[in-house]
Amino acid sequence: MTIENFNVDRLSLTLYAADTADRPLVVLHNYAGDGSAVMAALKDLHSPDLNLLCIGNLNWDHDMTPWYAPPLSPEDTPCTGGADEYLPLLLTEILPKAKERISGIPPQVGIAGYSLAGLFALY
């Protein structure tokens, strides 16, 4: 496995590229970190070889939300509904740059996330 860090726009990306060609690509949106804990957990679980692209430095309450939602508490921030703005960046810039860096063509591309990133993955 090779690990490569790169940026697209304001985003920090970490690609854990599979040693074998033509392995699936999983895109994981992170609130914090580079996904190293996720990759370690996958290894511990004896996961099949895959490419993992971790995307960080997101504007979490904007990029991951499809619609506006007010704050849940006085200390919270609103969700501002920027998923429609972020999705084209993911599809036209981030994914092509990640695919350039992996071996072969991924037979599947999946998207994963937790919390608001899980909502975005379903969106």
Regions from the language model: what does each represent?
Residues M1-P24, L50:
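A domain-start/cap signature at the N-terminus of enzymes
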Residues N7-D9, H46, I105:
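Short, structurally constrained coil/turn elements
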Residues A18-D19, P70, I111:
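Intrinsic disorder/low-complexity segments
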Residues D22-R101:
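Serine-hydrolase catalytic machinery in alpha/beta-hydrolase-like enzymes
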Residues Y86, S115-G118:
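Active-site loop->helix "elbow" adjoining a glycine-rich segment at hydrolase catalytic centers
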Residues I102-Y114:
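Alpha/beta-hydrolase fold nucleophile elbow
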Residues F120-Y123:
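Hydrolases whose catalytic domains are alpha/beta-hydrolase-1, hotdog thioesterase
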